[in-house]
């Protein structure tokens, strides 16, 4: 804005904001594939306001992917953007954008937009869950825990993220039917979840179950765990 109050807007940013459009402003966008992740994250943040990505920007992103630009992304940069995106209001739009840009098959080939994991992520966001719980909810229905380990290793996810995701993936089905378990089976579950040493992880585990099954109430399971700790 000039001294006289005149807006200097060579890229028509004000017009795009009013139209709720996310658009790249120069050819330099194509020089850094991290910008694909970043604009996907921005859509995850502003989608609820009605924002969308400009057609020409999406076309450029698709061209960048076709040219192999995302193949060279540094693992830590991918994780940084993923972790931030998980905490946005509509984290599923991060993945939807990457799918539209044809980058999902390269960056996250085992994550599907139409699987229960994505629904659990959406519910986790609605519940204002922490990022670590959202991550575990997203991956809960992965068919093989080795896939989760490979994903976490590939992008150097923090150990607490991978540990919770693996725990939820392996034990969520058993935990959801906990009231049907025998005392021995319940004890086996608690020992597997390491409730005596990993209470915070156990609490996150219960929160993840709330995202996976809308009718789940972790109070009973939490009380059982507390009673067991009292006895030991």
Write out the residue ranges for each language-model feature.
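Glycine- and charge-enriched loop/helix tracts that form the active or gating conduit
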Residues: 1-155
């Amino acid at each position: 804005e000039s001294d006289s109050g005149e807006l200097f807007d060579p890229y028509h940013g004000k017009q795009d904001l009013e139209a709720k459009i996310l658009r790249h402003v120069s050819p330099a966008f194509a020089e850094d594939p991290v910008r694909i992740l970043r604009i996907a994250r921005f859509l995850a943040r502003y989608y609820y306001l009605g924002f969308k990505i400009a057609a020409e920007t999406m076309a450029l992103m698709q061209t960048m992917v076709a040219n192999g630009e995302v193949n060279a992304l540094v693992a830590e940069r991918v994780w940084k953007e993923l972790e931030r995106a998980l905490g946005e209001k509509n984290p599923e739009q991060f993945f939807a954008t990457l799918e539209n840009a044809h980058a999902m098959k390269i960056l996250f080939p085992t994550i599907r937009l139409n699987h229960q994991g994505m629904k659990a992520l959406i519910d986790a966001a609605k519940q204002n869950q922490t990022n670590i719980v959202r991550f575990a909810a997203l991956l809960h229905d992965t068919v093989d825990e080795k896939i989760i380990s490979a994903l976490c290793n590939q992008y150097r996810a923090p150990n607490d993220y991978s540990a919770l995701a693996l725990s939820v993936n392996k034990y969520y089905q058993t935990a959801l039917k906990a009231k049907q378990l025998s005392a021995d089976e319940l004890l086996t579950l608690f020992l597997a979840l390491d409730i005596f040493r990993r209470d915070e992880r156990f609490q996150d585990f219960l929160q993840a179950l709330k995202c996976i099954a809308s009718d789940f109430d972790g109070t009973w399971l939490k009380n059982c765990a507390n009673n067991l700790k009292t006895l030991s």
